[in-house]
């Protein structure tokens, strides 16, 4: 029902003309043409991810990157994963249980928080899906710890997806339709309508289906979104926004990555991955899918939220956010493959597999109130905010898993998937229900004082009181294990920004953060008995732009430290204890330049030196020291660059480059994924002022490369092969 209604709405949006009553809204870009002068790195834009003081990115003593909807379309970033992968210093992968999971500044998974409109529902590895990027006005990225803003988990950074909002007094209609390789079809549309001088509504819909975005066998995918909102502003002092967001996705026979096999059995071995015992990535297995018939991963989530903004006078403001969220998710797939050498039954070799059936029933409620003031104290401008936040989460998850011996083997080169196994007996003791209820109350404050017109000092603090009621029930016996831990972490930061010259700002900050040893909602009973890990970070940097807006450059150097991660007891290697340490240090540089009106160049480069400073791992009952090793899925160097050139005002040529250096899939650093470089290109023709046609090629060199590691270290996600698409975009 949702699919058909979405398609009908999109058809209407894309084909129906609409008379413009005023200039286009900032979040509704028309057909893309390089225009030259602009704030290319959004340094003078206030962000919700960086502060609640309404500081601009230039004023904030931290590294902030913003990708606008226009930039998402220019670069052909269709989904959340593609968007996150384009952030300087980040890589992202589509692990089935953690779609669009991010690695940033030497850390990954739960240490990177992902928000929607400034609200963190749960750990990113629980809630994030590879949603269509059409629905976002912009994506804000705060790099480095942000627990002082958003609580536990935000150690490496925060990604805030800001949805499109209504604009008063404007009427416009936008559409985007594309078709491409692997039978991929995408359609999206949005409409902004003024109801009166004080009331406006906006609705956006998107639909994407593909035989497989990665060109993998039996891996059909579908994703759709429907977002709508209404804004009521009876006066300049008062506004109320009410919004609803709904997203769905489904991936058939979910791709778990390419399993590595011993080199002597490979038909077309590659150097994309090298591993212990001669394991290689065999190109002959590039499209193979070993999931059972009927296997799938899907999510169905709905968010209802409201935002009240009230200017009280005298520089005082009040904001109230209310959010309700509900989601159902399923993960029915084979989660690992173990290679067996050829024998009489399987001349090509075979895989033994384990199978899982995981389900999520997730409810979340949030209320946040913030009082702010922007005035002068002692002759100095002072911006202040004080807030209280309450979250309640009810999370139930059925977790059923087999051993590898419970399933029949499958041919490595000619897999004939078996049906999804049935019957509760196949799971045995690995059939449990996790019930989690989480109450969290937070108090936070920020203050920013201008010591001079060019010198800003910013500080903040947050206290969280977290109550977890965690129960694990073994379904076969009804036996329950329970724990009710509480946590009371305090996070804080202090930073300063100094304008040394017009358009040139230097900054420095020190900040702390906390993060659980694993996702709070999915942690084992044993892991809930551990304290939260603690982190701290130092960062210095600069932000530069010229008065014409043609040149913007930012740079940062940082060090992040995390302590009390899980390690193994030296006296008893079978026992997990806290006491491990992990750190990263690095530099980042982003730049955007418009040397002539028709040409725009932009890019970002990062270098990260990340290590386990203290970590012991249990191997066959023995504690093995992993100190000095690099964390999983952390490349030392990343690079992204783009060039856009407009010919005669109507045709724009684009080139886009992404590079990531080698990374490891295991803490032992025995399996290395080689570095890779991917080149995309586009040509866009604006054939009317309201419409443009774009031809885009992806991975033009048809590079065979690993982009991320999944759950088992011997499975690596292979990037999508060369593909092409053609897209029509309209704006009325």
Where are these predicted regions, by residue range?
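C-terminal beta-signal and adjacent terminal beta-strands/loops
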Residues: 659-666, 684-732
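Acidic/polar loop-and-plug regions of large Gram-negative outer-membrane beta-barrel proteins
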Residues: 208-210, 220-222, 226-233, 237-309, ...
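Outer-membrane beta-barrel translocator/receptor signature
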Residues: 134-137, 148-228, 234-238, 302, ...
């Amino acid at each position: 029902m949702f699919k058909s209604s979405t398609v009908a709405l999109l058809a209407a949006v894309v084909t129906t003309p609409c008379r413009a009553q005023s200039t286009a809204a900032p979040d509704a870009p028309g057909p893309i043409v390089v225009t030259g002068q602009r704030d290319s790195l959004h340094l003078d834009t206030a962000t919700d991810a960086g502060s609640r003081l309404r500081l601009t990115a230039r004023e904030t003593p931290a590294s902030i990157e913003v990708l606008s909807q226009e930039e998402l379309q220019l670069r052909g970033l269709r989904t959340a994963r593609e968007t996150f992968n384009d952030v300087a210093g980040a890589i992202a992968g589509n692990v089935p249980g953690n779609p669009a999971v991010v690695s940033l500044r030497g850390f990954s998974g739960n240490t990177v928080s992902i928000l929607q409109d400034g609200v963190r529902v749960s750990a990113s590895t629980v809630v994030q899906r590879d949603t269509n990027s059409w629905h976002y006005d912009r994506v804000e990225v705060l790099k480095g710890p942000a627990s002082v803003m958003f609580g536990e988990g935000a150690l490496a950074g925060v990604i805030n997806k800001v949805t499109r909002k209504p604009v008063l007094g404007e009427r416009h209609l936008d559409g985007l339709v594309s078709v491409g390789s692997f039978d991929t079809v995408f359609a999206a549309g949005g409409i902004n309508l003024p109801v009166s001088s004080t009331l406006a509504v906006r609705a956006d819909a998107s639909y994407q289906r593909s035989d497989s975005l990665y060109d993998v066998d039996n891996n059909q995918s579908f994703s759709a979104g429907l977002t709508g909102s209404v804004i009521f502003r009876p006066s300049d002092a008062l506004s109320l926004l009410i919004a609803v967001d709904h997203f769905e996705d489904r991936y058939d026979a979910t791709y778990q990555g390419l399993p590595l096999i011993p080199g002597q059995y490979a038909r077309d071995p590659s150097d994309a991955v090298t591993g212990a015992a001669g394991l290689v990535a065999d190109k002959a297995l590039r499209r193979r899918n070993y999931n059972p018939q009927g296997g799938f991963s899907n999510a169905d989530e709905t968010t209802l939220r409201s935002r009240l903004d009230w200017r009280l006078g005298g520089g005082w403001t009040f904001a109230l956010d209310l959010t309700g969220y509900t989601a159902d998710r399923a993960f029915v797939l084979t989660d690992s493959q173990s290679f067996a050498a050829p024998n009489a039954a399987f001349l090509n070799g075979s895989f033994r597999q384990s199978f899982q059936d995981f389900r999520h029933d997730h409810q979340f409620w949030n209320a946040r109130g913030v009082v702010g003031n922007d005035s002068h104290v002692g002759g100095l401008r002072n911006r202040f905010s004080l807030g209280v936040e309450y979250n309640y989460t009810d999370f139930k998850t059925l977790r059923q898993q087999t051993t590898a011996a419970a399933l029949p083997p499958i041919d490595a080169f000619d897999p004939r998937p078996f049906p999804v196994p049935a019957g509760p007996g196949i799971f045995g003791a690995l059939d449990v229900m996790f019930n989690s209820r989480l109450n969290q109350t937070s108090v936070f404050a920020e203050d920013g004082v201008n010591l001079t017109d060019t010198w800003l000092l910013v500080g903040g603090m947050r206290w969280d009181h977290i109550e977890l009621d965690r129960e694990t029930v073994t379904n076969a016996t009804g036996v329950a294990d329970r724990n009710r831990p509480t946590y009371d972490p305090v996070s804080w930061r202090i930073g300063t920004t100094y304008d040394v010259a017009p358009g040139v700002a230097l900054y420095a900050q020190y900040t702390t953060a906390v993060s659980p040893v694993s996702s709070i909602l999915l942690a084992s009973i044993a892991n809930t008995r551990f304290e939260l890990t603690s982190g701290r970070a130092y960062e210095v940097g600069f932000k530069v732009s010229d008065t014409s807006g043609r040149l913007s450059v930012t740079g940062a150097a940082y060090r992040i430290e995390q302590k009390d991660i899980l390690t193994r007891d030296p006296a008893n290697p079978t026992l997990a204890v806290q006491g491990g340490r992990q750190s990263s240090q690095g530099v980042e540089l982003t730049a955007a330049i418009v040397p002539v009106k028709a040409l725009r160049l932009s890019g970002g480069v990062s270098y990260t030196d990340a290590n386990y400073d203290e970590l012991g791992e249990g191997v066959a009952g023995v504690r093995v020291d992993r100190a000095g090793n690099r964390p999983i899925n952390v490349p030392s160097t990343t690079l992204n660059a783009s060039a856009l050139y407009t010919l005669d005002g109507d045709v724009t040529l684009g080139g886009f480059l992404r590079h990531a250096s080698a990374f490891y899939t295991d803490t032992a650093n025995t399996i290395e994924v080689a570095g890779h470089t991917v080149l995309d290109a586009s040509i866009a023709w604006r054939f009317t002022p309201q419409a443009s046609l774009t031809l885009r090629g992806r991975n033009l060199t048809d590079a065979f490369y690993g982009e991320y590691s999944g759950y088992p270290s011997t499975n690596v996600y292979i990037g999508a092969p060369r593909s092409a698409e053609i897209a029509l975009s309209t704006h009325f």
